[in-house]
Regions:
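Alpha-helical transmembrane segments and their membrane-interface junctions
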Residues: 173-189, 256-277
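Loop-to-transmembrane boundary segments
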Residues: 80-98, 158-172, 237-263
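Alpha-helical membrane-embedded segments
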Residues: 130-136, 202-217, 261-274, 280-303
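Ser/Thr/Pro-rich low-complexity tracts
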Residues: 303-415
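Juxtamembrane inter-helical linkers in multi-pass membrane proteins
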Residues: 152-153, 221-245
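Juxtamembrane/interface segments at transmembrane-helix termini
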Residues: 139-151, 183-191, 212-229, 276-282, ...
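Basic, amphipathic N-terminal segments
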Residues: 2, 6-90
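Membrane-helix interface and helix-disruption motif detector
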Residues: 110-126, 186-201, 275-284
Length: 415
């Protein structure tokens, strides 16, 4: 199919691989087809007439149709991932060298406006930017299959890491300052101050944000291993990952860490521009502010998430149905929390939700409604009791898309 799409787009040879535009278009078409199919089935249309008389059979058929369509969307997304990586790789390189060009234009305009002419400091600043951009270009080439420069900022869950992004920004500024001082010495400057007295605050902040990367990774790894945090791999990184949690909701601890670090970083860059002959002199009050922001960020990492838990299991009752005990073939409603981990609300992860009922593993059916799904949800699951479940006392547990199993609750099944 990829070869056919490449030919349709005018590729000269199938050896060139699939066309990136076709891959993106194929993914968009798959998403549109899934949404249309979900909304059609939500209104009761499209179900085979032979199954319409059986609510259980029609619900299972609808769930299987949606699951297959969701897998198609996921497959299309994986095919488009390579094209996205190429675009991101090129875009980041364009941004890096665009920043160098902007610096050159800014220096030229300020030199003309102030009438100071081109100085050795301007040459050193431009040279440091070119060297740093060249280093980033080389690093991007090594990781071009994962998005170039942004690959250094990706976490294990394929999301942009807030701690890594902040640490990378401070590291780039520190390297730029060192290259600037080195080039100032090369150009013959005599007033370059290489003492650490003025740059001690910068070094402390750099150590803080670097330690934060290690600590955040350790906290997340330990909480995932202890099943106190559920992590689902994202389909793609997004800029919003820096300020939001895995579910795309704004996160206060992440946002304050980015804003505080960004504001202090800008002030440090301004101080470097005003005094390019020494490391930026960062006041200790601002260093303390960054330390407080780091502490809040790490405490937020310790508090996020939680283990999924079942509170109760009851017989699902429809309107007009009589109250009765749970019997084979009935629907059971599982009430609790954490059944849909953050980032697992997409259709494909929802299809991996499983209920363990004694020795039987029952997949939770997808029940569509216009614009979403009525089942499963984060707090309730409805699943039919399989016929293979023997009457008697059985234990029920839920296995989420993250692979975490809940506690077990015993129920009595009557014949």
């Amino acid at each position: 199919m990829a070869v056919q799409e490449a030919r349709q787009c005018g590729s000269d040879s199938a050896e060139d691989g699939p066309c990136p535009h076709c891959e993106r278009s194929g993914h968009r078409r798959a998403v549109a087809a899934f949404l249309a199919r979900r909304d059609e089935l939500a209104t009761g249309h499209g179900v085979p007439p032979a199954l319409a008389h059986s609510p259980v059979a029609s619900r299972q058929w609808v769930s299987d149709e949606l699951a297959q369509s969701a897998r198609t969307v996921a497959a299309r997304d994986r095919e488009a991932a390579a094209a996205r990586s190429v675009r991101i790789h090129r875009g980041t390189l364009a941004a890096v060298w665009g920043a160098v060009l902007a610096l050159l234009l800014g220096q030229a305009l300020t030199a003309l406006a102030l009438g100071t002419g081109w100085t050795g400091t301007r040459t050193a600043a431009l040279g440091a930017a070119v060297l740093l951009a060249a280093a980033l270009t080389a690093a991007a080439r090594l990781h071009r299959d994962r998005g170039g420069v942004l690959a250094l900022l990706l976490g294990e869950d394929n999301r942009l890491s807030t701690s890594r992004a902040v640490a990378a920004a401070w590291l780039l500024l520190s390297l730029y300052a060192l290259l600037l001082l080195a080039l100032r010495l090369v150009t013959g400057a005599t007033q370059v101050d290489l003492g650490l007295g003025g740059g001690a605050g910068l070094l402390v902040v750099l150590a803080l944000v670097g330690w934060t990367v290690v600590a955040a990774r350790l906290i997340v790894a330990l909480r995932v291993a202890g099943r106190r945090l559920q992590k689902v791999r994202a389909d793609r990184p997004r800029p919003a990952d820096l300020l939001c949690d895995d579910d795309g909701r704004a996160c206060l601890t992440d946002t304050q860490y980015v804003l505080v670090s960004g504001a202090v970083l800008v002030l440090t860059a301004v101080r470097l521009g005003r005094a390019p002959d020494r490391l930026p002199d960062l006041p200790w009050a601002l260093v303390l502010l960054v330390a407080v922001s780091v502490a809040c960020y790490l405490l937020g990492k310790c508090a996020e998430g939680g283990r999924p838990k079942i509170f109760s299991v009851v017989r699902a009752r429809e309107a007009g149905d009589l109250d009765a005990p749970i019997r084979t073939g009935d629907d059971i409603e599982i009430r609790g929390t954490g059944f849909v981990p953050p980032g697992a609300g997409a259709p494909d992860p929802l299809t991996r939700l499983v209920v363990r009922i004694g020795p039987v593993h029952a997949h939770v059916p997808l029940v569509p409604v216009p614009g979403g799904f009525a089942n499963p949800t984060d707090t309730t699951l409805t699943v039919p009791l399989p016929a293979d479940v023997e009457p008697g006392r059985v234990e029920v547990s839920v296995v989420t898309a993250a692979g975490v199993e809940t506690n077990r609750v015993a129920i009595d099944v009557l014949d």
